[in-house]
Amino acid sequence: MVQVDLITGFLGAGKTTFLRRYAAWWAGQGVKVCVLENDFGAVNVDAMLLQDLEARGVELETISGGCDCDTHQRRMRTKLISMAMRGFERVIVEPSGIFDVDEFFDVLRDEPLDRWYQLGNVIAIVDALLPEELSPQAEYILASESAWAGSVLLSRCQLASDAQKQGAEVHLARALEACKCSRKFGPEEIIAKDWADLTTDDMARIAKCGYRQASCEKLHFDAHDAFTSAYFLELGLPRAQLEKNIPSLFTDPACGNVLRVKGFVEDDGRWYELNAAAAGLTAAPIPQGQQVLIVIGEGLDKARLEENLRR
């Protein structure tokens, strides 16, 4: 049976960054790997960040998250059927940061997928700089996306103090308890180190972490109502201006509760990936991009967002 791994994590936690490393590790073991990338919204920005994996023999499939639940499940099921017929040994699924993991497990239980796929690992990415307070919907997603994880990886550990890393672990435990989930993570199940320092032994440990069956008390809400996205195409703003102004989106209450900003900008003939959360912004070179910036959050005011970007 094809092993299928799920990499979860709230918006901006660093799923795509880890996925690149994880998929490359499996490919390096001689395993035929395909990544199924599922982004929130109609434009799949994260898929462009994985272009370099193709050079390592990793194939990439995408699903747009900008649709209703039934349509999304149907698209995912169709993709998984197609991939099962192409001889992959391992499929790695990266859902959006507001994904309902129950939806994924429901799809895997459907025929004929239940005869072709076997759940391998569930890996949860949690930001070491996780804010102290989140909305009830965000707290639920944090808990539900982590409940089945065999391993939790803290991201941005190089930027966090020991107290902040411990605070993120406590926050996760609190979110799980609030959802009446019995899942508790022991020290051996949490990896809290700079990802640049992950060793071959660390990756091998993660690659066999498995999963734990758990359940959370369901919080019923429409993710597309609770979380919205604002798209900015062909803004025409220079990289320096965007890097200067994007942080203000997280601190200006009139913009709404901004959770994540991602996109691309061209600077002197080179493309850069912009990736920002409340904890900070990064700009990294990328082979190809497109003039798009996406803001994801709660109660967004697009006009105010653009006003801040153009200052």
Each predicted region: which residue ranges?
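Conserved C-terminal guanine-recognition region of P-loop GTPase G domains, centered on the G4
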Residues: 83, 98-184
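Short aromatic/hydrophobic contact patches that present stacked aromatics
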Residues: 92, 228-230, 294
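C-terminal accessory "lid"/substrate-recognition subdomains
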Residues: 148-154, 158-289, 300-303, 307-311
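Small/polar loops that bind or transfer phosphate-bearing groups
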Residues: 37, 93-95, 156, 234, ...
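Flexible glycine-/small-residue-rich
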Residues: 37, 126, 276-278, 297
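Nucleotide-state-sensitive switch-loop elements of NTP-binding domains
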Residues: 2-13, 17-135
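Short secondary-structure boundary/capping segments
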Residues: 51-52, 114-115, 143-144, 221, ...
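Short, well-ordered beta-strand elements
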Residues: 291-297
